[in-house]
Amino acid sequence: MKIAIAGASGRMGQMLIDTVLRTPGVTLGAALDRPGSDAVGQDAGVKLGKTTGVIVTDDVRAGLSQADVLIDFTRPDATLNHLNVARELGTAVVIGTTGFTAEQKASFKTYGESIGVVWAPNMSVGVNATFKLIEVAAKILAQGYDVEIIEAHHKHKIDAPSGTALKMGEIVAEAQGTKLADRAVYAREGETGPRELGTIGFATVRGGDIVGDHTVLFAGDGERIEITHRSNTRQSYAEGAVRAAVYVAGKKGLYDMNDVLGL
């Protein structure tokens, strides 16, 4: 099975290429990067000190024609462009990009009518196990506990809160029979007054090279429960994405990591 990697010269792209090269049963079919990138025209393994035989291209159509599945951790506008080309060519897509609007996320179902699409705000097996723990806790602690979600990422991340943090908020809200849009508080400043009952607060930290830390805090009177996941490297994301690519190859429909992991 051949896999194409979008954003091939980036940190995540390089991790994905390395993971594909080390995974039995899959090969690197194409490596895509933005027009003007210094990586275009070079072997996809140059930064890794490896020779892959795959040349980085900015021609999306040419690249996707050489692959069964595209793994995309880029930006929303680029991902949507890739999805359009993939649909025309019948190439499945694994989406790890975050920062989509609600309308853009809703469009994934339409793409799934023609090709296989896996979309998840986080591909890590550990994070998806954490999602399940949060769901259980949210049901048990539905009364008498305030919910706060704290996330930290590196200084280069461009969206906030993170897609993973938002997913955690959605899980809490849905487990308690509500909608995140009705409960979310994304900023506090100045004299905010007492905390409003039932809200789900978000706090965002950006700095250094933090790969990704997420904590859901259930704060009650006299006790608090914290469920935390910390990523030390991007390797778990890459391994989960390749696992998702193997799962979705040859399928149609919209899937998430619960489907991939059989949760």
Swiss-Prot record:
GO biological process: one example: diaminopimelate biosynthetic process
Pathway(s) served: Amino-acid biosynthesis; L-lysine biosynthesis via DAP pathway; (S)-tetrahydrodipicolinate from L-aspartate: step 4/4
UniProt cross-references to PROSITE patterns, sorted A to Z: DAPB
Location(s), subcellular: Cytoplasm
Active site residues according to the UniProt entry: H153 (proton donor/acceptor), K157 (proton donor)
Residues spanning the signal sequence: none
Catalyzed reactions: (S)-2,3,4,5-tetrahydrodipicolinate + NAD(+) + H2O = (2S,4S)-4-hydroxy-2,3,4,5-tetrahydrodipicolinate + NADH + H(+); (S)-2,3,4,5-tetrahydrodipicolinate + NADP(+) + H2O = (2S,4S)-4-hydroxy-2,3,4,5-tetrahydrodipicolinate + NADPH + H(+)
Keywords for this protein: Amino-acid biosynthesis, Cytoplasm, Diaminopimelate biosynthesis, Lysine biosynthesis, NAD, NADP, Oxidoreductase
Binding-site positions, NADP(+): R34
GO molecular function terms listed in the Swiss-Prot or TrEMBL record: 4-hydroxy-tetrahydrodipicolinate reductase; NAD binding; NADP binding; oxidoreductase activity, acting on CH or CH2 groups, NAD or NADP as acceptor
Enzyme class: oxidoreductase
Family: Belongs to the DapB family.
HAMAP family recorded: DapB
Protein function: Catalyzes the conversion of 4-hydroxy-tetrahydrodipicolinate (HTPA) to tetrahydrodipicolinate.
Listed name of the protein: 4-hydroxy-tetrahydrodipicolinate reductase
Organism: Ralstonia pickettii (strain 12J)
Record lineage: Bacteria, Pseudomonadati, Pseudomonadota, Betaproteobacteria, Burkholderiales
